[in-house]
Amino acid sequence: MFFALCVALSGREVNKTRRTVNGVDHKDFFRDGKVGDWKNHLSVTLETENKIDMTIKEKFQGSGTQD
């Protein structure tokens, strides 16, 4: 099933042209997927950063995805 999903996604326009249908560049559409990397893409205050961190901890509590 995972392989089929990968095959299906590889046919997406953004993967062929390196741009989305709206013309957004590939590098702006895809991220590295590194923990905490969102901080490099958003300009937020320390207060907002703390709220985001707290929300993530709350929503993912018990999921096994947190440290």
From Swiss-Prot:
One of its GO terms (molecular function) is sulfotransferase activity. It is found in: Cytoplasm. One of its GO terms (cellular component) is cytoplasm. It comes from the Eukaryota. 3'-phosphoadenylyl sulfate binds at residues 31-33. It is an enzyme of class 2 (transferase). Keywords: Cytoplasm, Transferase. The keyword Cell membrane does not apply. The keyword S-adenosyl-L-methionine does not apply. Its EC number is 2.8.2.-. Sulfotransferase that utilizes 3'-phospho-5'-adenylyl sulfate (PAPS) as sulfonate donor. Belongs to the sulfotransferase 1 family. This is Putative cytosolic sulfotransferase 2.
